[in-house]
UniProtKB/Swiss-Prot annotation:
The lineage of its organism: Eukaryota, Fungi, Dikarya, Ascomycota, Saccharomycotina. This is Ornithine decarboxylase antizyme. Ornithine decarboxylase (ODC) antizyme protein that negatively regulates ODC activity and intracellular polyamine biosynthesis in response to increased intracellular polyamine levels. Binds to ODC monomers, inhibiting the assembly of the functional ODC homodimer, and targets the monomers for ubiquitin-independent proteolytic destruction by the 26S proteasome. It comes from Candida glabrata (strain ATCC 2001 / BCRC 20586 / JCM 3761 / NBRC 0622 / NRRL Y-65 / CBS 138) (Yeast). SUPFAM superfamilies: Acyl-CoA N-acyltransferases (Nat). GO terms for biological process: viral translational frameshifting. Pfam families: ODC_AZ. Belongs to the ODC antizyme family. Interacts with ODC and thereby sterically blocks ODC homodimerization.
Length: 255
């Protein structure tokens, strides 16, 4: 687990990324890829780096960062690490020690999803995903995105998109910017808009009480709805009981 996190951080610490983060007009970076990039013959385009910069008096995401000449050999392992770490956000704490078992299941899920994409069919969902669109977080993502907004968050932001929904696992905010939710929320909405997604779902840690209270007070401004968590009693035999959204408060808003 720690090795995967270190691998991702090392990748984000390349000279070009650090140079751009030193530019005062840039307040964030992003790395994004279509899951079909994992296929030898893929049509998902290449992974992309973006910066969130001020242009013409407003911020926007721009693909202005080069991956670098020596990244091709490492990129497949990196993409798998990002997928693993994103999906791991929904692994219940009780099962955090079962990394190998979780990884084995995840590889199978990703493989099934890629096969369905190759066959030009929709990914076949499992379990409760077939009956309740609210819990599509269980689906493997069509696209995975890593956000780094250092002005607002202590940690990396793990994201994935499936269908028209952008799932964003929000880390704890920095205390001195707790009320600046408008700025980081706009950055996330604009990233979702870049990929033509219609909705953003924010997964807020239940123990980040100040951030949750601030956002709940501003539901009207952000046009968000509070979504219920998955009912574990309604999970069927196909659902992976090691996964859950119960550690999060979930807000959904339109892009």
């Amino acid at each position: 687990m720690e090795k995967k996190v270190s691998h991702v951080i090392d990748f984000l610490s390349n000279d070009e990324v650090q140079r751009q983060l030193g530019d005062p007009s840039i307040s964030g970076i992003s790395f994004s890829f279509d899951i079909r990039t994992l296929l030898k013959k893929h049509s998902g385009g290449n992974p992309q780096f973006f910066n969130y910069s001020m242009r013409d008096s407003f911020h926007e995401w721009c693909a202005d960062i080069e991956l670098g000449a020596n990244t091709n050999e490492l990129v497949t392992e990196l993409l798998w690490d990002i997928i693993y770490l994103t999906e791991h956000q929904f692994l219940l704490p009780y099962y955090h020690g079962e990394h190998k078992k979780f990884q084995k299941k995840l590889v199978k899920r990703v493989g099934n999803h890629l096969n369905s994409l190759v066959n030009n069919s929709a990914s076949k969902p499992t379990g409760s995903m077939t009956v309740n669109v609210r819990h599509v977080w269980r689906n493997v993502g069509d696209r995975y995105t890593l956000l780094y907004l250092p002005l607002y968050f202590k940690e990396l932001i793990w994201c994935k998109a499936n269908g028209s929904i952008f799932h964003v696992i929000i880390p704890h905010t920095k205390e001195h910017v707790i009320h600046e939710h408008k700025e980081w929320l706009l950055a996330i909405l604009e990233m979702a808009g870049y990929w033509n997604l219609s909705h953003v779902r924010l997964y807020l840690p239940r123990d980040d009480l100040t951030n949750i209270q601030t956002l709940l007070k501003n539901l009207h401004w952000i046009g968000a709805n509070l979504l219920p968590n998955e009912n574990r009693n309604e999970c069927n035999e196909n659902d992976d009981i090691t996964l859950s959204d119960e550690t999060y408060i979930i807000l959904e808003c339109e892009c």
